[in-house]
């Protein structure tokens, strides 16, 4: 077993803060409409980006103790990205501010547990304020505003996303693909999405994005569990002989079958991805039939007297494209007969009319939308591959932020919603060191305004003073136009979910760091420098 090195108390917390600072200082320069870019050194060619989570993920520090701090603040960015798809830079900045101020107070003798409790209470209060000020997103104009701001003030992207949502609905499926030209455009194609991802991450052919994408694949649909390779050998032989890819939708794929598929995928012998069938019980059977009709295949079921081992070509479905990640599967342009699809939609519509339970009606409507609706595809074009990657990142951010805005509404942007929330914390009067936690949050939630101003070349303290002098809750600094104005009227807005999630994730990680008393990591005699840590 390798030797371990342990660091305690003040030294441990200082090492964590050093790691946090190195990540946060790199990320926060991208905040706001005048935020700067960061160039990442990749194995093929450099990537230019101002996407917070992309930058954070690239940072690994040499010092193992500092790297722990870096990893913790990277988790803030990742969690916020997973929850909302945007707001990662603000979340990272908030975490840094809370950790820095918290450690100052703990060094001066404050009780870490009480400080953490104060941070939690203050965060809850701010979240309540944000929810109270949230405005529901109605109309195309508001969607354009949210999408444009999240896309780093690119109006073309804002309009494209608004058009896409208008055509497939707020809850419709919108994907982003490379264009074959330099133009960025919107297409709407028939498609279906369900909430099941690949059964093993080894099936993700694109390991950077953790997705599996197939063009013109065969689709095998069954309600059986596949646990032996023998069950699917006939299908695999056909697929391999034609050089095609295969999506397997089954109750489950495990045991020897999963192991053998993964081995063949790694060797490059097969292009296969397996996902669990969506739904449960009778609903699962109905959804599998929907997929079969959409793709022109058959549900291979023993209830119909069909067996996988006795497979025939007509049982396989087809689609123009399938995309599978850890959580969902999207089937685009199923090759099913249009008359069969229309008939299936009519059957579901009839079931909706006779359904009594609201839950049943809702589920049927979802199925009908998936079968009869479409997938909006934003095709991204650019002059260079570097520009293309950067543009796709911005569109992904804008798309996620817009969906978050539809979900929970919007608040004033430019850091103002958090800035104005600071005043509500004046009413909190907690005992002892809990009040220190409140003051830490109060200071931290003013930092986004300071940083946006600094990135725009203004003095943060002057901007803060000017905003405090005005009582209007929407008044703030518009970094894009370099004027002070009513930001809500000017269309500078943020999704409430993005702001809320970023604050909560930052407070959670800050509380963990502030209550840390020891760090333990491996020690390599040949590689690692001796530090203040104890080596065992």
From Swiss-Prot:
S-adenosyl-L-methionine in keyword set: no
Example GO molecular function: ATP binding
Pfam families (UniProt xref): Cpn60_TCP1 (PF00118)
Compartments (UniProt record): Cytoplasm
BP term (GO), one: protein refolding
GO cellular component, one term: cytoplasm
InterPro entries: Chaperonin_Cpn60_CS, Cpn60/GroEL, Cpn60/GroEL/TCP-1, GroEL-like_apical_dom_sf, GROEL-like_equatorial_sf, TCP-1-like_intermed_sf
Residues binding ATP: 30-33, 86-90, 414, 494
CDD domains in the cross-refs: GroEL (cd03344)
Keywords on record: ATP-binding, Chaperone, Cytoplasm, Isomerase, Nucleotide-binding
Signal peptide per UniProt: none
Principal location listed in the UniProt entry: cytoplasm
The keyword Cytoplasm appears for this protein: yes
Catalytic activity: ATP + H2O + a folded polypeptide = ADP + phosphate + an unfolded polypeptide
Enzyme Commission (EC) number: 5.6.1.7
Self-association state and partner proteins as the record states: Forms a cylinder of 14 subunits composed of two heptameric rings stacked back-to-back. Interacts with the co-chaperonin GroES.
PANTHER family to which the protein is assigned, alphabetical: 60 KDA HEAT SHOCK PROTEIN, MITOCHONDRIAL
Similarity remark: Belongs to the chaperonin (HSP60) family.
Function text: Together with its co-chaperonin GroES, plays an essential role in assisting protein folding. The GroEL-GroES system forms a nano-cage that allows encapsulation of the non-native substrate proteins and provides a physical environment optimized to promote and accelerate protein folding.
Entry protein name: Chaperonin GroEL
Underlying gene: groEL
């Amino acid at each position: 077993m390798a030797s371990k090195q342990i660091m305690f108390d003040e030294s441990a917390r200082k090492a964590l803060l050093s790691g946090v600072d190195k990540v946060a200082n790199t990320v926060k320069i991208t905040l706001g409409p005048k935020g700067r870019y960061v160039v990442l050194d990749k194995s093929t060619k450099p990537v230019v980006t101002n996407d917070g989570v992309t930058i954070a993920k690239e940072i690994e520090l040499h010092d193992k103790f500092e790297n722990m701090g870096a990893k913790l603040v990277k988790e803030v960015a990742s969690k916020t990205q997973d929850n909302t798809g945007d707001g990662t830079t603000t979340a990272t900045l908030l975490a840094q501010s809370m950790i820095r101020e918290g450690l100052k107070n703990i060094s001066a003798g404050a009780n870490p547990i009480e400080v953490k409790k104060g941070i939690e209470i203050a965060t809850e209060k701010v979240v309540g304020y944000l929810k109270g000020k949230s405005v529901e997103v109605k109309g195309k104009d508001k969607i354009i505003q949210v999408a444009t701001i999240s896309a780093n003030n690119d109006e073309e992207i804002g309009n494209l996303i608004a058009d896409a949502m208008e055509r497939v609905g707020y809850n419709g499926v919108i994907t982003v693909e490379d264009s074959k030209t330099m133009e960025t455009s919107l297409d709407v194609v028939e498609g279906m999405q369900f909430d099941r991802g690949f059964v093993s991450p080894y099936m993700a052919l694109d390991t950077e994005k953790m997705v599996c994408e197939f063009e013109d694949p065969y689709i095998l649909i069954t309600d059986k569990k596949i646990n032996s390779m023998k069950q699917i050998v006939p299908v695999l032989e056909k697929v391999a002989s034609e050089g095609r890819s295969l999506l397997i939708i089954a109750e489950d794929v495990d045991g020897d079958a999963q192991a053998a598929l993964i081995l063949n995928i790694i060797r490059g012998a097969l292009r296969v991805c397996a996902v669990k069938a969506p739904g449960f019980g009778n609903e699962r059977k109905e959804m599998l039939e929907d997929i079969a009709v959409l793709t022109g295949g058959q549900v291979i079921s023993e209830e119909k007297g069909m067996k996988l081992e006795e497979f025939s070509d007509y049982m396989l479905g087809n689609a123009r494209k399938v995309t599978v990640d850890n959580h969902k599967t999207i089937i685009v342009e199923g090759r099913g007969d249009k008359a069969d699809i229309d008939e299936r939609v009519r059957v579901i519509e009839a079931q909706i009319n006779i359904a009594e339970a609201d839950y049943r009606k809702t589920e049927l409507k979802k199925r009908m939308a998936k079968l009869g609706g479409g997938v909006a595809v934003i095709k991204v074009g650019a002059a260079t591959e570097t520009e293309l990657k950067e543009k796709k990142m911005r569109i992904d951010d804008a798309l996620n932020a817009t969906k978050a805005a539809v979900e929970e509404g919007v608040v004033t942007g430019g850091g103002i919603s958090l800035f104005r929330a600071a005043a509500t914390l004046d009413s909190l009067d907690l005992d002892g060191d809990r009040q220190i936690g409140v003051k830490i949050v109060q200071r931290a939630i003013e930092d986004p305004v300071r940083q946006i101003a600094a990135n725009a070349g203004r003095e943060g303290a002057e901007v803060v003073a000017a905003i405090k002098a005005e009582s209007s809750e929407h008044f703030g600094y518009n970094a894009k136009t370099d004027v002070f104005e009513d930001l809500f009227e000017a269309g500078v807005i943020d999704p409430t979910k993005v702001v809320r999630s970023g604050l909560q994730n930052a407070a959670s990680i800050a509380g963990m760091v502030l209550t840390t008393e020891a760090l333990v990591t491996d020690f390599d005699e040949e590689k690692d420098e001796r530090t203040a840590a104890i080596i065992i």
